[in-house]
Curated annotation (Swiss-Prot):
GO terms for biological process: DNA-templated transcription termination; transcription antitermination. GO terms for cellular component: cytosol. Involved in transcription antitermination. Required for transcription of ribosomal RNA (rRNA) genes. Binds specifically to the boxA antiterminator sequence of the ribosomal RNA (rrn) operons. PANTHER family: ANTITERMINATION NUSB DOMAIN-CONTAINING PROTEIN (PTHR11078:SF3), N UTILIZATION SUBSTANCE PROTEIN B-RELATED (PTHR11078). This is Transcription antitermination protein NusB. It holds the Pfam family NusB. The keyword Transcription applies. GO terms for molecular function: RNA binding.
Length: 164
């Protein structure tokens, strides 16, 4: 994969994280509210303004946002299964958002290698998380990846995404 695509995907993941983190404070109750939150995200608007690229061109980040939002219950069940002694409702918003994002990529996105999904989550945790957050996140995501690898957990097909 070209370095440019990696850098672009990293930026798309960061944007998806920021939108999803914002939604942890003000949840979207419908797909239309989700679209509005995505379009109106300050980071999305600033990025679109700076680059001249319309918000609609942020396809990968939208796929991640919609995928995590649409599958949050299943993702929380997966995270709970591998977060021994930690309930999802007791996790910090940053950590939970990063776990959901990476778990979505692990379970629903066959096009993303597990090591990439985990590494990207760890990079974002270094940027946005606190203290030992990366160790906590790494432990859970590594367990999810191993469960997928040995068949204890099944990979799901990503639902067809709707457009922004």
């Amino acid at each position: 994969m070209a370095k440019g695509k990696n850098a672009t995907r990293r930026g798309e993941r960061e944007l998806a994280f920021q939108v999803l983190y914002g939604l942890s404070f003000t949840p979207a109750r419908s797909l239309e509210e989700l679209r509005r939150s995505f379009r109106m995200s300050p980071d999305n608007l600033a990025r679109s303004e700076e680059s001249g690229v319309p918000v609609e061109a942020c396809g990968f980040s939208w796929e991640l946002v919609e995928g995590v939002w649409s599958n949050s219950s299943a993702l929380d069940e997966t995270i709970s299964r591998f977060s021994h002694n930690w309930r999802v409702d007791r996790m910090g918003r940053v950590e939970l958002t990063l776990l959901r994002l990476a778990a979505y990529e692990l379970v629903f996105r066959a096009d993303v290698p597990p090591k990439v999904a985990i590494n990207e989550a760890l990079e974002l945790s270094r940027q946005f998380g606190e203290g030992n957050a990366k160790n906590f996140i790494n432990g859970i995501l590594d367990a999810v990846a191993k469960a997928l690898e040995n068949g204890e957990l099944q990979r799901c097909a990503a639902p067809s995404n709707t457009s922004i």
